[in-house]
Amino acid sequence: MKLISICALATLLLTTTVGLAQSRKDQKIMQDAQKAKTTLLETSPGLERFFEDSAGYVIFPNVGKGGFIIGGASGNGVVYEDGEPVGMADLKKLNIGLQAGGQAIIEVIFFETDVDLKRFKTEKFQFAAETSAVALKSGIAFNAKYKDGVAVFALPKAGLMADASVGGQKFSYKAF
């Protein structure tokens, strides 16, 4: 009986520790997402209308991309609905082709309607191979439009890479 109690206590402590570690990681990502939103709006004030009018959006504050012939990207982000955080998302991409370098970017995906946001949250959402992000420069977001219910923007943070595609990115979503 004593062994069972010790095992139960050990399991509880391990579960609590893992939960706290994940919670801290999520909190850090949420803080980074808020900073990323500020940076995006400072860089391209035209995004304000997307933040205000979209059904929801996901901000990936630190997407790492890299490759030489074979490349990949990954990042964690926060999903917002009506401006409020509702969950966490992660992004993965693997591709083969002419590419070289490495880059860190901020990526934001806006969902035009509730149906588009729900599709992201309930399916294993991914972009078609030809989809690309609008690389943000001052003023460019004013002319951007939704395509198939989404609008994607990327802001380079560091590094250099000759690839602006987001096609083939796969996402997963976990509600709070």
Residue ranges and their predicted role:
Residues 1-7:
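Bacterial N-terminal signal peptides that target proteins for export
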Residues 7-16:
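Bacterial N-terminal signal peptides
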Residues 17-21:
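Sec/Tat signal peptide C-region and signal peptidase I cleavage site
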Residues 22-176:
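Small-residue-enriched, tightly packed secondary-structure blocks
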